[in-house]
UniProtKB/Swiss-Prot annotation:
Protein name: Actin-depolymerizing factor 4
A single Gene Ontology CC term: cytosol
PTM characteristics: Phosphorylation at Ser-6 is required for resistance to Pseudomonas syringae pv tomato AvrPphB.
UniProt keyword list: Actin-binding, Cytoplasm, Cytoskeleton, Phosphoprotein, Plant defense
GO molecular function: actin binding
One GO BP annotation of this record: actin filament depolymerization
Organism (species): Arabidopsis thaliana (Mouse-ear cress)
Coiled-coil stretches: none
Amino acid sequence: MANAASGMAVHDDCKLRFLELKAKRTHRFIVYKIEEKQKQVIVEKVGEPILTYEDFAASLPADECRYAIYDFDFVTAENCQKSKIFFIAWCPDVAKVRSKMIYASSKDRFKRELDGIQVELQATDPTEMDLDVLKSRVN
């Protein structure tokens, strides 16, 4: 089903991988890419549960936009182990203007396809999505 705003469809694999992350915890992160020629959002990369946040951050291109899901494990002040699912809209300042516009206009529709996102983060620079930022958003 294409998005009226940008004409982008969401590939079924996007939802399937998200459900695997959410329900089975078989992935630490998922990076999604818009394939403009095919007019759809696709899965670009899936990270194993053993991978670190640094591995995830390194998988995002420095000069291109992406959507990403990150399963963030943390310990509360009460010493409880918890997890939050982050949606990260990665849109670096140096990305092409057309790409930024397509990702911005498709974001809300894409997010609606992924039921279970708990925290949303938008980042134009790596410092806007470092571990300290994630930690501050879960409290």
